[in-house]
Amino acid sequence: MVPERVAVWPGPIWALDFTGHGASSVPLGGGYSVEILMADADAALAQLGSLTLVGHGLGAYVALLLAGARPQQVRGAVLCDGPGLAGGGPRPVTPAVVRPVEKLEQAPDPFALLELARDVRPPDYATSFVRQACQLSELDRPISVCAIERPDWLAAVVEEPGAAVTTLAEALSHYAR
């Protein structure tokens, strides 16, 4: 069943369970990073071919990185609000030893929640992927920001040429052309 918010999309819709989330594999003892999740999405991209990416929360950051890393294959990245959007902030903090909550059915691996909540997201790192996408993509607007929340990395992204603030429906209509 296709969610109503993406019903304007004319093509197939695929969903990805990142490592440690949903029905995907769970690595023993954690070891999660956004770049590991980007590798999951990159493997899907290699199998499916050129795609428009819609990422919610943590998935928005992954979509941005993949748009910069594979600008010829990503036919637009749409960044939306959702859990994990902010990450761990723009700089590292003192590590703490925290016992993750007990695993709940259908919830992400507790280590994923813990490690990805601390994932550092410097604005200049994020904007380097925007610039790469803009320079190498054939699209006039390879990044669309639909998120209302503006963590530091996303506030920097919206200031870059080639990134547009728009609604989800407008972004999907734009990339469907």
Feature locations, PLM:
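Conserved acidic catalytic loop of the alpha/beta-hydrolase fold
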Residues: 35-52
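Short "lid" loop at the C-terminus of a central beta-strand within the Rossmann-like core
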Residues: 20, 83-86, 92
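A catalytic-pocket lid/entrance helix-loop region that shapes and gates access to the active site
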Residues: 90-118
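Conserved hydrolase catalytic core segment
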Residues: 50-87
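Conserved catalytic-core motifs of eukaryotic protein kinase domains, centered on the activation segment
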Residues: 24-30, 89-90
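Conserved serine/cysteine hydrolase catalytic core
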Residues: 109-177
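Conserved HGGG/HGGXW glycine-rich cap/lid loop of the alpha/beta-hydrolase fold
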Residues: 1-23
